């Protein structure tokens, strides 16, 4: 059904982290559809997504879970040991586990671990069961406008970008799918094209937006929000986002015109209905609410709130509806604004 006709992947089902970056110990269950991560800055939303993405990438034989994690977090001296949570109880060992329907992969490392030389658990079975998995991570900052020669500059050590930026450029450069667009794929592309006013073109390692019959525009000259929409167009067009793939999107609402937020919510729900497992982190009330408003009865949506308890430990709460989250900084801020607005009106 629909255009996303790839192999149905094995959705990720949970992540466990102990003494890893900001986490003392946490278990986060994932829904097989759209997972919306909320929480204030510094509670590890992006960390969880990067860790899950590293596990997805490790489904390929030539990618190691620990090395990918290191390249996504970019600690000093590429030392994974620097990702150990420096807590007061003296435990200097971190453990991480990512599970899917079919397999699991884990790693253990300590502050003394050299480079990314972590101990990996169950890697072979993970590679065997998950080898068909495609995953893509869209970072919060738009990068396609800087794609030209970025790989080379990073390799030479002239600039530092973590792997999420290099990976998204590589994914966007994939040769456009030669197949005629199916009705379902066309539906997505038309919606996105209307917003971004054009199609993406790649020439000499540089990205352009081509509006209809007009001359192509350098990505630098296109508003950043539109570049994000154009990137999504490209990933659907070239087949990177298909049934069974996993999409991680860090703050999709950043720099996007508020009038396009409902369309963005609708697209995420449409992709979820095509069996793409999605993780988005957001601070945006409108995106969170529009996902709620646009969902259908069949939509598989889970809200995940990360928050600090009284002791400062990061905890996790999940709910099937946005309003049901007890720890919800987005809602709290919205209510506060509403109360202040009422107060002004009553003066």
Question: Would you name each region that the model predicts?
Answer:
Residues 257-258:
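Conserved D-loop-proximal element of ABC-family nucleotide-binding domains
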Residues 26-32, 239-242, 270:
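Phosphate-binding P-loop
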Residues 8-53:
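Pre-Walker A-like glycine/lysine-rich segment at the N-terminus of P-loop NTPase domains
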Residues 250-252:
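Walker B catalytic acidic pair
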Residues 281-283:
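H-loop/switch region of ABC-family ATPase nucleotide-binding domains
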Residues 243-245, 275-279:
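Loop/turn-to-beta-strand initiation segments
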Residues 263-264:
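Conserved hydrophobic alpha-helix in the ABC-type ATPase nucleotide-binding domain
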Residues 2-16, 55-247, 309-347:
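Phosphate-coordinating catalytic segments in nucleotide- and nucleic-acid-processing enzymes
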């Amino acid at each position: 059904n629909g255009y996303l006709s790839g192999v149905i992947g094995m959705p990720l089902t949970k992540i466990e982290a102990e003494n890893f970056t900001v986490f003392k110990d946490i278990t986060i269950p994932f829904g097989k559809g759209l997972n919306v991560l909320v929480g204030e800055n510094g509670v590890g939303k992006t960390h969880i997504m990067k860790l899950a993405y590293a596990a997805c990438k490790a489904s390929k034989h030539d990618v190691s879970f620990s090395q990918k994690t290191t390249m996504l977090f970019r600690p000093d001296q590429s030392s994974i040991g620097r990702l150990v949570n420096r807590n007061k109880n003296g435990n200097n060992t971190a453990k991480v586990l990512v599970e899917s329907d079919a397999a699991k992969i884990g790693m253990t490392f300590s502050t003394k671990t050299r480079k990314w030389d972590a101990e990996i658990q169950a890697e072979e079975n993970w590679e065997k069961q998950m080898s068909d998995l495609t995953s893509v991570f869209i970072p919060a900052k738009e990068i396609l406008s800087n794609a030209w020669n970025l790989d080379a500059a990073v390799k030479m050590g002239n600039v530092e970008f973590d792997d999420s930026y290099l990976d998204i450029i590589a994914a966007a450069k994939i040769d456009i799918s030669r197949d005629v667009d199916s009705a379902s794929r066309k539906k997505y592309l038309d919606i996105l094209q209307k917003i971004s006013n054009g199609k993406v073109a790649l020439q000499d390692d540089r990205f352009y937006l081509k509006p209809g019959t007009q001359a192509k525009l350098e990505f630098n000259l296109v508003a950043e929000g539109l570049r994000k929409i154009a990137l999504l167009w490209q990933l659907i067009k070239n087949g990177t986002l298909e049934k069974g793939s996993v999409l991680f999107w860090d703050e999709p609402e950043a720099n996007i015109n508020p009038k396009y937020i409902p369309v963005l919510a609708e697209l995420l729900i449409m992709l979820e209905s095509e069996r793409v497992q999605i993780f988005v982190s957001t601070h945006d009330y409108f995106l969170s609410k529009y996902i709620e408003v646009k969902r259908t009865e069949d939509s598989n949506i889970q809200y995940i709130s990360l928050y600090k308890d009284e002791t400062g430990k990061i905890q996790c709460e999940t709910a099937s509806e946005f309003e049901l989250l007890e720890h919800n900084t987005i809602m709290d801020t919205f209510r506060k604004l509403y109360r202040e607005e009422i107060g002004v009106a009553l003066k």
